[in-house]
Swiss-Prot record:
PANTHER family: HISTONE ACETYLTRANSFERASE-RELATED (PTHR11135), TRNA URIDINE(34) ACETYLTRANSFERASE (PTHR11135:SF7)
Cofactor, free-text remark: Binds 1 [4Fe-4S] cluster. The cluster is coordinated with 3 cysteines and an exchangeable S-adenosyl-L-methionine.
Gene Ontology, cellular component aspect: cytoplasm
Catalytic activity from the UniProt record: uridine(34) in tRNA + acetyl-CoA + S-adenosyl-L-methionine + H2O = 5-(carboxymethyl)uridine(34) in tRNA + 5'-deoxyadenosine + L-methionine + CoA + 2 H(+)
Assigned keywords, A-Z: 4Fe-4S, Acyltransferase, Disulfide bond, Iron, Iron-sulfur, Metal-binding, RNA-binding, S-adenosyl-L-methionine, Transferase, tRNA processing, tRNA-binding
Gene Ontology terms for molecular function: 4 iron, 4 sulfur cluster binding; metal ion binding; S-adenosyl-L-methionine binding; tRNA binding; tRNA uridine(34) acetyltransferase activity
UniProt name for this protein: tRNA uridine(34) acetyltransferase
């Protein structure tokens, strides 16, 4: 009887699809109800992943994009897999706002987490085993119809470079083993296998503190295969950093930013408006400084308003009436301002932490703060031109607009940052302001890596957006990843490096699983990079 129910749902969806009817979430649920009334089985609405089990391979090609949950998960062309390291002490002590850690009110959980976040719960469930966490997340994404051939691996759980080198190597190796679906003898072997694996690690992100980002830590991160480093900057005011016991200075942030960029890595800042000692005006000034002062200018930002959580020093201050976090409308005002002045080469990767409202004592409890910011900006006539707001998948998802091929042009923006010259190359629909692909090219300032000399130009990032989505009538590919934009951007980067900067060599910081792509463009391994003589 259950099989008949599932076939009923599948056949009705396919029939309406062929008739060109709208198949949104509401209509899918109605179809489930209609079939349940026919077969009168005493179960609730079957999940989409359960329905897919009863579909043929041909049917799945149509059903998966229609039933796919949370399309934003792979809207940028890659599937994100976040893996949590085991709980360990923070290298510098504890910030006043930081929950979690060993012996916290939440038990032994990773530093700065509560144990209630999805990634932390997955970590706890698998005893922080990197292999099991990675496998479980990939399987979870596949069940709800997401492609998992391109994986962005994010290592969460505190200052990863502060852990023992042996732990770091083992942890990344086990994540790669899970993607490779086989055991390897060493990190190097796991990386080599992953270059052509079914689930390729196309990006690896590591979180650290500005004072744990010296040449030594950067060398280790590059050895692991890192392509992006997220810095816990929080504030650029030393008095606030000191008050909050951050244990690092703004000078550490400036130095770490320069070293990372000159090593070809992407730089993401974690920023926390509303910290003790700050104000709305100070936070607005901070964002303006970060986006205009060449000492900073990160490639990406995550914005988390300061929250009061039990078990922290900040909680005790709050109880004594010494601190009051931002109200929702204050946080929206500050973040909207930040987004309205954000340069087109910055990407907003997250607004608001993944902490459940139940553990937030005071502060912004809405998990959809980003949506509220978006609505506020629309109402005020403000516009954000960051990468995320302009990328092809997000524009289609939010506005239903696709790029017009006649208006797709190569666009270039040069700017000075961290002592060097940055060139942001992109293919854009200039009429509709839609971003299709981009490349970050850098003439470094003071590189320390032996592979990089004064005749070397760096490609810090190449990204072509891709996404599939079921449209009302047809399954259309909103995917730009196989139209040659990547090759054209690389060709232009090589031309600029040779003709305009007189360079003899170009190096690319390539994800492990993208090395084969660069080999096809004539690149070969040069230390931690893929390189080519010009």
């Amino acid at each position: 009887m259950k099989e008949k129910l599932m076939r009923c749902i599948i056949e009705r969806i396919l029939k309406e699809y062929k008739e060109g009817k709208t198949l949104d979430k509401k209509r899918i649920e109605q179809i489930k109800s209609e079939c349940l009334r026919i077969y009168r089985i005493g179960i609730g609405h079957p999940s989409n992943s359960e329905i897919l089990k009863y579909a043929t391979e041909e049917e799945k090609k149509i059903l998966i994009p229609i039933l796919r949950k949370k399309p934003v998960r792979t809207i940028s062309g890659v599937a994100v897999v976040a893996v949590m390291t085991s709980p360990a002490k923070c290298p510098h002590g504890k910030c006043i706002f930081c929950p979690g850690g060993l012996d916290s009110v939440f038990g032994d959980v990773p530093q700065s987490y509560t144990g209630r976040e999805p990634a932390t719960m997955r970590g706890l469930m698998f005893n922080f085993d990197p292999y099991l966490q990675t496998r479980a997340r990939i399987e979870q994404l596949e069940k709800v119809g997401h492609p998992t051939d391109k994986i962005e691996l994010i290592i969460m759980g505190g200052t990863f470079p502060a852990r023992e080198i042996e732990y770091q190597d083992w942890f990344i190796k086990r994540c790669l083993d899970a993607m490779n679906e086989r055991e390897s003898k060493s990190l190097e072997e796991a990386q080599k296998i992953n270059e052509t694996a079914k689930h390729r690690c196309v990006a690896l992100c590591i979180e650290t503190r500005p004072d744990y980002c010296s040449e030594k830590e950067i060398n280790q991160m590059l050895k692991l295969g890192a392509t992006r480093v997220e810095l816990g900057v929080q504030s650029i005011y030393n008095e606030i950093l000191k008050l909050c016991k951050r244990g690092h200075s703004v000078e550490d942030t400036i130095k770490a930013t320069q070293l990372l960029k000159d090593s070809g890595l992407k730089v993401s800042y974690h920023l926390m408006p509303g910290m003790p000692g700050s104000s709305i005006e100070m936070d607005k000034k901070m964002f303006k400084e970060i986006f205009t002062n060449p000492d900073f200018m990160p490639d990406m930002v995550k914005i988390y308003p300061c929250l009061v959580i039990e078990g922290t020093e900040l909680y005790e201050m709050w109880k004594r009436g010494e601190f009051k976090p931002y109200r929702e409308e204050e946080a929206i005002e500050v973040i909207s301002y930040a987004k309205s002045i954000m340069p087109k080469w910055v990407r907003t990767s997250r607004i608001q932490r993944d902490i459940p409202a139940t553990v937030i004592v005071d502060g912004v409890k809405k998990s959809n703060l980003g949506e509220l910011v978006y609505k506020y900006m629309e109402k005020k006539g403000l516009r954000c031109r960051c990468i995320r707001c302009r990328e092809v998948g997000h524009v289609y998802y939010k506005k239903g607009i696709l790029p017009d091929p006649e208006h797709i042009k190569l666009v270039r923006e040069d700017y000075e940052a961290s002592g060097g010259t940055e060139i942001f190359l992109s293919f854009e629909d200039v009429k509709n302001d839609i971003l299709i692909a981009f490349l970050r090219l850098r003439d470094p300032y003071k590189p320390f890596r032996k592979e990089i000399d004064d005749k070397t130009m760096l490609v810090r990032q190449l990204h072509v957006f891709g996404w599939e989505k079921a449209l009302t009538r047809d399954i259309k590919e909103v995917s730009w990843q196989h139209m040659g934009y990547g090759r054209m951007l690389m060709k232009e980067a090589e031309r600029i490096a040779k003709e305009e900067f007189g360079k003899k060599k170009i190096l690319v910081t390539s994800g492990i699983g993208v090395r084969e792509y660069y080999r096809k463009l004539g690149y070969k391994r040069v230390g931690a990079y893929m390189g080519k003589e010009l």
